[in-house]
Design a protein with these regions (language model features):
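Aromatic (often tryptophan-rich) hydrophobic motifs at membrane interfaces
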Residues: 96, 255-375
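Acyl-donor-binding surface of acyltransferase catalytic domains
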Residues: 91-217
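A structural signal for short, well-ordered beta-strand segments and their strand-loop junctions
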Residues: 72, 108-115, 222-224, 272, ...
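Conserved, well-structured beta-alpha core segment at the onset of a catalytic domain
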Residues: 49-108
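C-terminal "cap" of GNAT-fold acetyltransferases
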Residues: 185, 189-192, 367-382
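A conserved beta-strand-loop-helix scaffold within acyl/acetyltransferase catalytic domains
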Residues: 3-66, 114-119, 168-304
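Short, high-confidence coil segments that cap the C-terminus of an alpha-helix
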Residues: 38-40, 104-107, 266, 322-325
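A short, internal acetyl-CoA/4′-phosphopantetheine-binding micro-motif in the GNAT/acyltransferase core
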Residues: 75-86, 193, 297-306, 334
């Protein structure tokens, strides 16, 4: 039987998601309302009348020419990528009707992010690689991909070959490991079949010491409400100035709160660390099914010594665990192992949790209208 693709309602999409162990929060239908400047629709894949896959498509219209757009499925769609549930269906059986639909919608290019893991490295393997720099060994591994993985997926490699053969293209990652809109490398903690005590014991000595130091120093972590987003945002703006990135407006986070929690109360949580009656740090966490993501974080420079960031991560991990989550996701890392790289500190911080680094298949593009795609690429390049 042939697969067909058609628009489904947001409620149909949500019902599909409830039947899954998890999907990316970027594929929630309500996420489209957070993304200002994009149009959106939920697509369903059908075998006859049976819904067998779903995805959120965001359309970015060309300025002044709304009939043409870039179609984007962040960390999606949610389909049978590795032919597990439907072994008789090849990947092109799934993607061809999606491309036809997007072309009918006026898209000149489709960008997607298959949620398919390719390789994993345990924290101990990464630490061993980092140690080679400290010991000044000859030719220490500069990048994560230079280290032999503890696990790799043959099926994912096969999928990559299939996508290439069907005309999908992938932008090469730069030296930091970033070639996509969403991170290709992430750091995660497996919460399954472990007690909280065992998870805590899996942290390195520095992490455990910092969590205890925060508690002894009087750092108090609590859940915030919507009105507390203003406190989070004040610290977030300070963080942006320190780390040299452009901060999002408070209204973005208020919209994120309203949309995610409006559809599913408690999906987005705000965690606030207070020290001496002021906000020292704050974070946002998103949960979908059995997966929890650390989404945004902010911290003051003045209070860094009392380690509120470690305390916040531990608080989020505990909530994820008590909610039945199987994976706690600290999101993106660079693949650098060079201690002189300015992105190394973030890698080192996350490795201290004792989890694992995971590489995804990355984002892929399919050109539907080459002239429009080239013109849009030039426009984006000029914008910087």
């Amino acid at each position: 039987m042939k697969l067909t693709v058609r628009v489904i309602s947001a409620d149909q999409h949500r019902e599909w998601i409830t039947q899954r162990s998890s999907v990316s929060f970027l594929q929630l239908p309500e996420w489209s309302n957070v993304k200002v400047g994009w149009k959106a629709e939920s697509l369903g894949w059908f075998l006859g009348s049976e819904l067998v896959g779903a995805g959120l498509v965001l359309y970015r219209p060309v300025p002044k020419i709304p009939a043409r757009s870039l179609a984007y499925l962040p960390e999606g769609p949610d389909i049978d990528w590795l032919q597990q549930a439907h072994p008789d269906l090849a990947i092109n059986d799934w993607l061809a009707p999606m491309l036809a639909h997007c072309r009918e919608r006026g898209a000149f290019q489709v960008k997607m992010g298959p949620p398919v893991a390719t390789r994993r490295w345990k924290a101990d393997s990464i630490k061993d690689a980092m140690a080679k720099w400290r010991e000044e060994e000859a030719n220490p591994p500069a990048h994560l991909h230079d280290v032999i993985a503890d696990w790799h997926s043959v099926e994912a490699q096969h999928l990559s070959v299939q996508l290439n053969s069907r005309g999908w293209i992938q932008e090469t990652a730069n030296g930091a490991g970033f070639g996509d809109v969403q991170p290709r490398y992430v750091f995660q903690i497996d919460l399954r079949d472990r007690t909280l005590g065992e998870i805590f014991a899996g942290f390195n000595q520095l992490w455990r010491r910092n969590i205890r130091k925060a508690e002894k120093s009087g750092v108090v972590v609590s859940l915030g409400q919507r009105e507390d987003l203003a406190d989070f945002h004040r610290v977030y703006v300070q963080t942006a100035a320190r780390d040299l990135f452009t901060p999002r407006a408070l209204s973005y986070f208020e919209k994120m709160w309203d949309e995610l929690n409006g559809a599913y109360p408690g999906r987005l949580t705000l965690h606030i660390a207070r020290y001496q009656d002021h906000v020292a740090a704050a974070t946002l966490m998103v949960r979908v099914g059995t997966h929890a993501w650390y989404s945004y974080g902010a911290s003051t420079t003045a209070d860094r010594d009392v380690r509120p960031s470690n305390a916040l991560q531990w608080d989020m991990i505990q909530l994820a665990y008590s909610s039945g989550c199987q994976i706690y996701d600290l999101r993106g890392i660079a693949d650098t192992l060079n201690p002189d790289d300015h992105l190394f500190g973030l890698v080192q911080f996350k490795v201290g949790t004792g989890g694992f680094a995971q590489e995804y298949l990355g984002e892929w593009d399919y050109i539907l209208r080459s002239t429009w795609a080239k013109a849009y690429g030039l426009y984006q390049a000029r914008r910087g």
